Amino acid sequence: MTTHRPDTPLPHIEFDGRPATEEDLRIPVLYGYGHFTALQVRDGRVRGLGLHLARLDAANRELFDLPLDGDRVRELIRHALDGAGLRDASVRVNGYLPPGASRTTLMVTVREPAARPAGARALMSVPYARTAPHIKRPGEFGQTYYGILAGRAGFDEALLTAPGGVVTEGAITNIGFWDGGSVVWPDAPALAGITMTLLEQELERAGRPSERRPVTLEGPDGVGRYPAAFVCNSQGLAPVRRIDDTAFAVDDELMRELGAVYDGAPQNTV
């Protein structure tokens, strides 16, 4: 249940377990080098919590050569949720290492819970590949830039592609395709989203394993060979109705099945 305290403005931001000060907020402004994860909390629980903690720890080790204790992260999330007076929320955990610091500074941001995506999505392909795409990090100018251009052109999101029209990922989502028998993920450098990973795990558990294959905009591996497609992120799943001029059928039965698979993934108390 959401019981936001009216005297606590949202977003509610804490740094290392205390309300953000002006000095704290200079950290993300002046030292953008960092990483984050975004999650949806419902009744104090999170799907894939262990995956989020592992993501933060792996990125922290790679960027700062420091481990990140999962119990500390959970404690800070709980503290920020209590501070905001919410048990249903959108939560973002950012990790930074300001100059001279020996311990990672954690910024926890709490907002109202996000609604699941509504309606089928139209994607505009763009020639953009992220550096170190396996790390989820703030300040992605290219993704934001192309996302805005896609919106101006009447699309819902940008679809990132590598040289040769190789499909990698959505600007803020992972993309999956349906070949009539199984889910296919692009075999290309991309962020392994938590929702995508949960779907992979749960489909495998259900005896319907997904696959990785090269996917391109055109040619024998082109998107047009697939009857349906979908995107997913921490907010949920949504069907794709077109990529550029290639139309896809909205397979309601497929989306119900995938939604049920995702909803069946275990939830963990923060």
For each feature predicted by the language model, list its residue ranges.
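Ordered, amphipathic secondary-structure segments that act as subunit-interaction surfaces
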Residues: L86-G95
